[in-house]
Amino acid sequence: MSDEEVEHVEEQYEEEEEAQEEAPSPAEVHEPAPEVHVPEEVHEDALEDMREEEEEEEKPRPKLTAPKIPEGEKVDFDDIQKKRQNKDLMELQALIDSHFEARKKEEEELVALKERIEKRRAERAEQQRIRAEKERERQNRLAEEKARREEEDAKRRAEEDLKKKKALSSMGANYSSYLAKADQKRGKKQTAREMKKKILAERRKPLNIDHLSDEKLRDKAKELWDTLYQLETDKFEFGEKLKRQKYDIMNVRARVEMLAKFSKKAGTTAKGKVGGRWK
């Protein structure tokens, strides 16, 4: 028996139940109408109308018969209910499958987005690395060019000095002694500079404050401040002393120049004839 035939049988069965509910009981159908006491004043037409209505009510209604089911076939309502449940389950399963497919698609899109972000981040890091490497190469190239130029300048100056020395050495031995003296003076200056560096290195001790506490750090800072203040005071006093010394030297030079002028004038006025000749 096909599904369409089963549904058709179900519809006929439901229509039969509704008709039986709406149909009146046999007692109501065959119950005689009550007698009506009509007053004498009522017109005969009204009586006839009432009789016609009573006759219509007393007419028997057609009996409803159940639909005929083909012989050899039985309607299994459990099977119908089971099919409905299976249909609902299939629809629910389809909804669940579509939900999980959409969720799986969203997860795949999220994974693809993360992969694109990671790829872009790696590309950006690679670009930064290449840019930094190029910048490093450029700095190295500039440093090499600078060192090469300095080396060429030093070589050129050395060649020029050598040419000057050769040209001047050909002029005589006197210049060689002059060069020796100049080299000696230069050596003395370098020695004095080295001595100054050595003295400063001895005076300037390394500041080791990693192991000190807060109180000792404050004491050390106060000590350094006092030392700096004393150095500035000494510097100011030495500057003032140097100014006074320069002023005294200028005064002495002015007096010496004035005395030299007066002595020259006195020498010219004291000239005279001594021993038959002018002095």
From Swiss-Prot:
Task: Please provide the Gene Ontology terms (biological process) for this protein.
Answer: regulation of muscle contraction; sarcomere organization; skeletal muscle contraction
PTM-bearing positions, type Phosphotyrosine: Y229
Matching entries from InterPro entries are given as: TNNT, Troponin, Troponin_sf
Which residues are recorded as modified (Phosphoserine)?
Answer: S2, S98, S169, S176, S177, S213
Read off the PANTHER family from this record. TROPONIN T, TROPONIN T, FAST SKELETAL MUSCLE
- The organism's taxonomic lineage, starting at the top: Eukaryota, Metazoa, Chordata, Craniata, Vertebrata
Composition-biased stretches (Acidic residues) = 1-21
Which Pfam family is an annotated match for this chain, by its short name?
Troponin
Q: Which family does it belong to?
A: Belongs to the troponin T family.
Keywords in alphabetical order, please: Acetylation, Muscle protein, Phosphoprotein
Q: What is this protein called?
A: Troponin T, fast skeletal muscle
Single GO molecular function: troponin I binding
Q: Where is this region: Disordered?
A: 1-82, 121-200
Q: Where is the composition biased (Basic and acidic residues)?
A: 28-49, 70-82, 121-163, 191-200
**Transmembrane portions of the chain:** none
Function, as annotated, reads: Troponin T is the tropomyosin-binding subunit of troponin, the thin filament regulatory complex which confers calcium-sensitivity to striated muscle actomyosin ATPase activity.
Q: A single GO CC term, please?
A: troponin complex
- Identify the SUPFAM superfamilies for this entry: Troponin coil-coiled subunits (SSF90250)
- Residues modified to N-acetylserine: S2
